[in-house]
Each structure stands twice: as C-alpha cells, then as structure tokens.
Amino acid sequence: MNAAIHVQGLNKTFSNKSALLDLALSIQPGEMVALIGASGSGKSTLLRHLAGLACCDRSNGGQVQVLGREVQSSGRLNGQVRRLRADIGYIFQQFNLVNRLSVMDNVLIGCLGRMPRWRGSLGLFNREEKQRAMVALDRVGLADLAAQRASTLSGGQQQRVAIARALTQRAEVILADEPIASLDPESARRVMEILADINRQDGKTVVVTLHQVDYAVRYCPRAVALKGGRIHYDGPAQDLSKPFLNDLYGADEDASLMITERSRRVRQKPRLVLAKV
C-alpha cells in the first residue's frame, strides 16, 4: 500500500537556524497521527510543508509526497500544487474564516479547488455543492447556523465550521494545526471527537498537531514527537511516558500537558455519531 504521506530528507532553514533536520516520515492511508512537541519544535512547519504552504531548502531540501503525488522537492513546489491541495484539507489554529461571510458561504469555499475559477470567483455554487455543504454542517452540529455571520460564532463553533469546510472539500488528507489550542475543554473535546469520527467512519488520513498530550493519547493511536526539528519519538501514543515527556517538553512544563491515568487506561470513544458526506 502506498503511503498517504511520505517525507524524505526534509530540511528547512530560517535565518541560518534549522527548523527541520533531515526529517523522514511515512503515514499510511486511514491513520490518525498526533504531532507533539514543545513550541518551536517544528510541528507547524512540518504541517505547512505537507500542504505545500511552505517550501523546503533548495539545497538538499528533501521531498514531500501526498497520496502518491509530489508536493515539493528541493525547494520547488509541484506546478500542479493547487490541484493537489484539493485533496488536502487544512484546518488552522485561528480558524481562517471570512468573518463577514455567512457560515454557509465559508463552508462552500471548500468547493473552490474542484471547480472552474470563473465560477468560484462569481460565487456560482450549484445545488449539489450547496447540499454537500449543508450535510457537512449537519455533521458538525451547526446546520441551524448556516445563515449566520461567521463573526458571531464562538471559537469552538468557528473551528467546527473549518472542519465542515474540509468535509465539503472532499479532502482525503486532513491536516489540523493546533485546532484546539485556544478552545475551552468542552469545545476542544468536541472538535477532537469530530476529527476522530471522520478518521474512523470515512477512513480519512488525519494529522493533527497538539500541545495537549492528553488529547493525543485519547484520540490518536500514533504519536510523532518532534524536538529541535527532528523526530524524537514515533510510536503508539499510549506508550508515551512521563519521563519521556519531561525530556521532550522540559521538567518545568505545565502539568496539564502530561498524561492522566484515565487517558492511559483507555482512549475515549467518540460520543458523536456522524453520517458520511
């Protein structure tokens, strides 16, 4: 089976400082993987390279492939990267919604990568696309807010709109960059349950960067830990130990990042039951 994501020898330098160092990673179709690590470890940088939103170094920069297609190699993006991004849903930490638009219009933006530019620029979405967007909103529990302006939503609701947009996009790979970093515990739980259900029910490959190890253990079978731009651990999330995490984050890191006994005993099963889009 071809890997959903394949990274080989990836290097990225910012102002003579290495952000990613000879990084190699392979993720199989249908996996849900947590990228963990302290701030500045390279998590978000790696995710942006997977989506073709950033370029690796031109000299020995390495290669990134998604769904068997080259996204970039040695500092050059694939000329068809826009078409490739149609299969990659990207969920940003700060929601990345257009506040003046309605919830529905924000979700319909997910259709743009698979439609002619002229139709997208005019906002001419057909009935099937609108129905798909409404089904996606229903999945995340926001169908009744479709006509509401995005700016009026809470942070948790806005993040769920971003997930609905990725569903409408029909992305095969979903990359979520710190999707719960600014959310309250209940909103964070709901967002992670939705992502986990999309992974399990639809078989989508989901890669999520997390600062909260508790959530990585609870929802992601596999964890990849980065430190100084290198992979420091790659294995079962439940095997992460407190001594290892002390080394990864530093002994003085906030205790909320550590694994609770409940998380270690059993990964919580999602409570939401979602229909496929």
Swiss-Prot record:
Main location: membrane
InterPro entries found in the cross-reference section: AAA+_ATPase (IPR003593), ABC_transporter-like_ATP-bd (IPR003439), ABC_transporter-like_CS (IPR017871), ABC_transpr_PhnC (IPR012693), MetN_ABC_transporter-like (IPR050086), P-loop_NTPase (IPR027417)
Keywords: ATP-binding, Cell inner membrane, Cell membrane, Membrane, Nucleotide-binding, Phosphonate transport, Translocase, Transport
Location in or out of the cell: Cell inner membrane
CDD domains for this protein: ABC_PhnC_transporter
SMART domains: AAA
Catalysed reactions, semicolon-separated: phosphonate(out) + ATP + H2O = phosphonate(in) + ADP + phosphate + H(+)
EC id: 7.3.2.2
Membrane topology summary: Peripheral membrane protein
Stored Pfam families: ABC_tran (PF00005)
Signal peptide feature range: none
Domain of life: Bacteria
Segments forming domain ABC transporter: 5-253
Keyword Oxidoreductase: no
Function of the protein: Part of the ABC transporter complex PhnCDE involved in phosphonates import. Responsible for energy coupling to the transport system.
Family affiliation: Belongs to the ABC transporter superfamily. Phosphonates importer (TC 3.A.1.9.1) family.
Protein name: Phosphonates import ATP-binding protein PhnC 2
Organism the protein comes from: Pseudomonas syringae pv. tomato (strain ATCC BAA-871 / DC3000)
Gene: phnC2
